[in-house]
Amino acid sequence: MIRFILLQNRQGKTRLAKYYVPLEDSEKHKVEYEVHRLVVNRDPKFTNFVEFRTHKVIYRRYAGLFFSICVDITDNELAYLECIHLFVEILDHFFSNVCELDLVFNFHKVYRYLILDEFILAGELQETSKRQ
């Protein structure tokens, strides 16, 4: 199960956060800080999977943005790595070559048009086709 999805820039600003488990606001900020600290300084030669508390974080960097997904320790890492890539492809299609500014100024479209909820529902991957 997906615990949360974060899109952060290199400076640690969270551009998009979607939590599938209830957390207090203070805990959310702490999680965002810890995840950023884990992924930003990691050597590119290492894998894109890292243990985080009792879960694991799968991340991928696209330009200046880090797309991170926290999942259960037993979940398939490669499936969620492809999930990140699918999300980026959908954003590229929706925004015509997405960049960080698209997410800053059009974040309501990502939520209002339910781009993320079209293929992830209640923390589970539902749809893997970008055509549907």
UniProtKB/Swiss-Prot annotation:
Q: How does it sit in the membrane?
A: Peripheral membrane protein
Q: Where in the cell is it found?
A: Cell membrane; Membrane, Coated pit
Please give the PANTHER family that the UniProt record associates with this protein. Answer: ADAPTOR COMPLEXES SMALL SUBUNIT FAMILY
- Tell me the protein's name: AP-2 complex subunit sigma
The record, for InterPro entries, names: AP_complex_ssu, AP_mu_sigma_su, APS2, Longin-like_dom_sf
**Alphabetical UniProt keywords:** Cell membrane, Coated pit, Endocytosis, Membrane, Protein transport, Transport
- Record gene name: AP-17
Q: Which GO terms describe its biological process?
A: clathrin-dependent endocytosis; protein transport; vesicle-mediated transport
Which organism is this protein's natural source? Zea mays (Maize)
Q: Which Pfam families match?
A: Clat_adaptor_s
